[in-house]
């Protein structure tokens, strides 16, 4: 009996020894720092650690994930292993690829190899400093859950994603692979190129130089907007450390940002409204990790706006506190670009303590103040004479050049201004134009049939060869965009050019 017990003890000891970790296994947590990403959600910061006990092969990529936002830092891996750092920022998951990671090269879009009909060199932006121009996409791009068809490309290495143009383009609502004081007009080799093939829109700042830092060399990088909402930053040439770039004349940022606008009565000007901009989310990347041949990929996460029914909204398991607004037929957390309507229609109070069954017996037509209003008509704006912008400051003075097609230069009207007056004015204008054309035709027929009449003699005395000559010559080097202000005079703030 004792022999059997002793044998059992030996077996258990050997089993325990076999299951215990061997020396040297696991992670080699040496000193140093790797990729880092920082997501800013008001008052939220925490550090993530690598999961212990996972053995990585020497040539395998090691992945770290932070599910709470905040700051993510990793130790340097031994040998020649590369890394991918993944960070969850509530709205996006960012993956940062180091220079030696093969996927970073795959994310670079070779514009030179693309279809030439889909590639355009923006001649205005390529020859100016602190300019911005609107471009229409060939597809709806979901940005923070909001479908966008127009974006604004700036010479300063970023894309402005806002619907309403204001003076602080660099402050918020941007996609910034590397926002800095770039001057494409410094060199003939500097260009701002964009490419659109229907599924991806790419903007490339090619061989651009920093204003006042031209001796440091040229920068080449791009931002890609994919139709599924993914955003990619790819860096080909970064000749200097990004933290060394001065921000005294222009903000220096890398990341994403979005905001909503609120209209409030202006205390200074009667019957006017003040537009205040509130940034509700920002993703900041560590600028020290922006190097040549690196890349960042942002994958969008589901938001409340994607739910189109009350049942789907209320049963959502997202981290957002989704609520259903029956008046607007919209699912929202209350913090998005449509917050103005959410407040105006009392959606926050409507959703308190109510279930989807409570809305089924209500008359939808009577419940909605304006049944023709679409939840996706954009930000609520005003037609008042005065408009102010609060709560944002910047050192930038980028000017805006309107898109050649003239789209998107005026603000959207509020729901109450849409409807019969617009259609009635259009009809009256068409009728007047038809009557004018008919009158001219009848006058021509009459004059041709009565050459000795007073009207015919009046026009004969004033025949065209007595009129002063007025010729329009085409100047290939002249800009088709309106001048923002006289050359040599520059003032702070963004200026929007009026289209001629």
Swiss-Prot record:
<feature type="transmembrane region" description="Helical">
    <location>
        <begin position="427"/>
        <end position="447"/>
    </location>
</feature>
<feature type="topological domain" description="Cytoplasmic">
    <location>
        <begin position="448"/>
        <end position="500"/>
    </location>
</feature>
<feature type="region of interest" description="Disordered">
    <location>
        <begin position="479"/>
        <end position="500"/>
    </location>
</feature>
<dbReference type="GO" id="GO:0005576">
    <property type="term" value="C:extracellular region"/>
</dbReference>
<feature type="compositionally biased region" description="Basic and acidic residues">
    <location>
        <begin position="47"/>
        <end position="60"/>
    </location>
</feature>
<feature type="region of interest" description="Disordered">
    <location>
        <begin position="359"/>
        <end position="379"/>
    </location>
</feature>
<dbReference type="GO" id="GO:0043235">
    <property type="term" value="C:receptor complex"/>
</dbReference>
<keyword id="KW-1133">Transmembrane helix</keyword>
<dbReference type="GO" id="GO:0043025">
    <property type="term" value="C:neuronal cell body"/>
</dbReference>
<comment type="subunit">
    <text>Interacts with NID1. May interact with CTTN.</text>
</comment>
<dbReference type="GO" id="GO:0005615">
    <property type="term" value="C:extracellular space"/>
</dbReference>
<dbReference type="InterPro" id="IPR002165">
    <property type="entry name" value="Plexin_repeat"/>
</dbReference>
<keyword id="KW-0964">Secreted</keyword>
<dbReference type="GO" id="GO:0001525">
    <property type="term" value="P:angiogenesis"/>
</dbReference>
<keyword id="KW-0654">Proteoglycan</keyword>
<keyword id="KW-0732">Signal</keyword>
<dbReference type="GO" id="GO:0005923">
    <property type="term" value="C:bicellular tight junction"/>
</dbReference>
<dbReference type="GO" id="GO:0005737">
    <property type="term" value="C:cytoplasm"/>
</dbReference>
<protein>
    <recommendedName>
        <fullName>Plexin domain-containing protein 1</fullName>
    </recommendedName>
</protein>
<keyword id="KW-1003">Cell membrane</keyword>
<keyword id="KW-0796">Tight junction</keyword>
<feature type="glycosylation site" description="O-linked (Xyl...) (chondroitin sulfate) serine">
    <location>
        <position position="33"/>
    </location>
</feature>
<comment type="similarity">
    <text>Belongs to the plexin family.</text>
</comment>
<dbReference type="GO" id="GO:0030425">
    <property type="term" value="C:dendrite"/>
</dbReference>
<comment type="function">
    <text>Plays a critical role in endothelial cell capillary morphogenesis.</text>
</comment>
<dbReference type="GO" id="GO:0021510">
    <property type="term" value="P:spinal cord development"/>
</dbReference>
<dbReference type="Pfam" id="PF01437">
    <property type="entry name" value="PSI"/>
</dbReference>
<keyword id="KW-0963">Cytoplasm</keyword>
<keyword id="KW-0812">Transmembrane</keyword>
<feature type="compositionally biased region" description="Polar residues">
    <location>
        <begin position="368"/>
        <end position="379"/>
    </location>
</feature>
<feature type="region of interest" description="Disordered">
    <location>
        <begin position="46"/>
        <end position="78"/>
    </location>
</feature>
<feature type="glycosylation site" description="N-linked (GlcNAc...) asparagine">
    <location>
        <position position="197"/>
    </location>
</feature>
<keyword id="KW-0325">Glycoprotein</keyword>
<feature type="signal peptide">
    <location>
        <begin position="1"/>
        <end position="18"/>
    </location>
</feature>
<feature type="glycosylation site" description="N-linked (GlcNAc...) asparagine">
    <location>
        <position position="80"/>
    </location>
</feature>
<dbReference type="GO" id="GO:0005886">
    <property type="term" value="C:plasma membrane"/>
</dbReference>
<feature type="region of interest" description="Disordered">
    <location>
        <begin position="20"/>
        <end position="39"/>
    </location>
</feature>
<feature type="compositionally biased region" description="Basic and acidic residues">
    <location>
        <begin position="479"/>
        <end position="494"/>
    </location>
</feature>
<dbReference type="InterPro" id="IPR031152">
    <property type="entry name" value="PLXDC"/>
</dbReference>
<keyword id="KW-0965">Cell junction</keyword>
<keyword id="KW-0472">Membrane</keyword>
<feature type="topological domain" description="Extracellular">
    <location>
        <begin position="19"/>
        <end position="426"/>
    </location>
</feature>
